[in-house]
Amino acid sequence: SSANMSFRHKDRIYISATGSCFGTMKKEDFAVLSMDGTVLSEKKPSKEWPLHLALYEKSSETGAVIHTHSTFSVLWSFVPAKNDQDCIPDHTPYLKMKLGTVGLVPYEKPGSEALFQAFRERVGASDGFLLKNHGPVVPGKSVMDAFFRLEELEESARIAWELFRAGLE
């Protein structure tokens, strides 16, 4: 798998299991966690479940989290940020309207405690996140809300990347 997603239902977090694929995912492909991160199912959760848990802890409004390795977000993460708390320029108003600020999290090995610590240190400062050389992590009130916010982040990263390549950024 090259991504992971989760949603909150009552006092549980349902997160894509290790090795699951968005394109073929069924309800059996989710691991179940308690709100303190205890695994409650036989399925093994994505190794990046602590990123998700940090966003659920940040806000009771968070109902879902999506993390991908989408092309333009990853490309943009290589460009030196002018502002680590808001690293994707808002060339159109929609990124701010739909998501807000996008914080840059320094590169750490995927799935590592160092990554989770770097993420926790920044989780309060921004609305969405870009893991350097890795990809975006976006919370939402629902799965569709998280998806729409992620889509806007990726489109904004594409616009910024194209302007950067053209020497206009």
What is the predicted function of each stretch?
Residues 1-169:
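Glycine-rich flexible loops
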